[in-house]
């Protein structure tokens, strides 16, 4: 969608900052343990585990740390059993928000998620209220658009669904289960992406064209991401170029 890469840049900067504090590492390790526990410990046979390992590597988690988390998940420790719950709601300006959590205390989690919404003029919705606006898929991006022909040839041959060119970057779209295969094919061809992830991509966008509302949306998303039980926060917000310029000052 329009503005996708710009919002993604904000998220990735925050992810790198959080990784320094260790918060992202903690959340990713939790997800690796869960993925390994619920599926095959071999990432080549477990698309979910493969996707979260890619996420771990993108924030410079070591292979040793990743392997220990996988081993923990396959060890069957009941202390690692957690509920995976998604919450849905709206922020100011009709921005749809999908919050993925892993928790050992549902009451605590829903209370903290609801507080983040209401404190920032948002509302926690019911199950199904916004989930239909998002599609789970793999996204592999390249900042060098001159690679379009090479990327298209390799990616489509590997089963990618589409390649988008917005004039500034290339976005390879895959089925989430096929994400690892397409990424491997691109890497084997010497086409190393600038970012790659399995995400929940919005089918529509909510336009925010003033800084005040944009700051409220970002504050709400920051509050949600800072909740220990929250794994991922997805939204369909799209900031205008003018708003983006002011936010990045």
From Swiss-Prot:
Domain of life: Bacteria
GO BP field: regulation of DNA-templated transcription
Signal peptide: none
Keywords per UniProt: Cytoplasm, DNA-binding, Transcription, Transcription regulation
Cellular component annotations (GO), alphabetically ordered: cytosol
Localisation per UniProt entry: Cytoplasm
Pfam family, one: Transcrip_reg
UniProt keyword Acetylation present: no
Keyword Repressor listed: no
Entries under InterPro entries matching the protein: Integrase-like_N, TACO1_YebC-like_2nd/3rd_dom, TACO1_YebC_N, Transcrip_reg_TACO1-like, Transcrip_reg_TACO1-like_dom3, YebC-like
GO molecular function, one term: DNA binding
Stated family: Belongs to the TACO1 family.
PANTHER family the UniProt entry points to: TRANSCRIPTIONAL REGULATORY PROTEIN YEBC-RELATED, TRANSLATIONAL ACTIVATOR OF CYTOCHROME C OXIDASE 1
HAMAP family noted in UniProt: Transcrip_reg_TACO1
Protein name (database record): Probable transcriptional regulatory protein Psyc_0938
